[in-house]
A protein has these predicted regions:
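Conserved ATP-binding/catalytic motifs of P-loop helicase motor domains
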Residues: 1-181
Length: 181
């Protein structure tokens, strides 16, 4: 299978042996608007991206808590146009989202705040340039309509492999994660 591992930040991408979402798709930083989505670069770079998108089987995205709604919708739109099965959600590419939504939130600048606001209208249609109800990935049109299967991992591995870390420390981390003291 042709698998691409992506992350929101460069450091996380290095840690998982992948690339940033922006680098792989050629997105500019900032708000992703449908009216501005296009493959950028030289003609050769653009064709290389098209070939890469058409050959994809799966994408794994780490740090899902930082993945904004506009960015996930942009990934879906590009793959629907240039993926292996145009017109299908994510162009027929299997998408795996990983991470803890209680970790770091999506980053929204002051200039981008107006794009993320509560909406009372029909949420079953893409809204794009009209905004999203929140910056969280799960409020993207692509996620709400993508049929994602949610799994909750409950066993902690990282702290259990370190003999110096006790159960009290692991419980303390869990309380912090949930905003309890």
């Amino acid at each position: 299978k042709n698998l691409q591992v992506l992350s929101f930040t460069g450091l996380a991408a290095l840690q998982v042996g992948g690339r940033t979402i922006h680098s792989f798709f050629g997105f500019d930083l900032g708000l992703q608007k449908r009216s501005h989505l296009q493959l950028i670069g030289t003609p050769e770079q653009t064709e290389n991206r098209r070939r890469a998108f058409r050959s994809l089987d799966a994408i794994l995205i780490d740090e899902v808590s930082m993945l904004r709604a506009d960015l996930l919708d942009a990934v879906d739109a590009i793959l629907q146009e240039h993926g292996p099965r145009p017109g299908e959600p994510f162009g027929g590419v299997q998408i795996g989202l990983f991470g803890d939504v209680l970790q770091l939130p999506p980053i929204v600048t002051d200039d981008e705040q107006q794009a993320f606001r509560p909406r009372a209208d029909d949420l079953s249609t893409p809204i794009w340039d009209d905004g999203w109800i929140s910056p969280w990935f799960f409020d993207s049109f692509a996620y709400r309509t993508g049929g994602f299967l949610r799994l909750t991992l409950t066993r902690i591995f990282r702290q259990q492999t370190d003999a110096t870390v006790g159960a009290d420390f692991v419980r303390s981390l869990q309380r912090l994660r949930e905003g309890r003291t």
